Amino acid sequence: MEKHECGSCTLCCKIQAVPQIKKPAGKWCPDCIPGKGCGIFKSPTRPQICKDFYCMWVNSPSLPDKYRPDKIKFYVSGTEESEFLHVCVDANYPMAWKEGAGKELIDHIRNAGRHMLVFVGSHEYFIQGKNKPIPKSIINYMQVKGQQALLD
């Protein structure tokens, strides 16, 4: 099965910080054409962090279009080998991961036994994968950050 194409989704161009070009998280990249794509996608000047970015929706062709990041207002990154997945939510839609198709996707990932760190603006939350112990690295990280784990 082939990968999804980004198409008009440019959410990673907004949410993700890009230190190489001093782009803060939550602001549009100057090379992004919102709703159209990255203006330098195939250019050698494209920042390395962008080249290395792993969007779960793009790389999971079995996920339906309703879970495309620009539709659910967050992206999920990480690979099968990742200890946990990152869920990065557009700060303009802080509840997106808790309602509608966004919640469906979070529940699907959790029920598959995957741990998630959810980032919403300056807030971070941990969601424990179903029937999986919490890794010590996550416990230590959350204690350092002073956050409480969300355990359902």
Where are these regions (language model features)?
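Short loop/turn segments that flank or connect secondary-structure elements
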Residues: 1-152
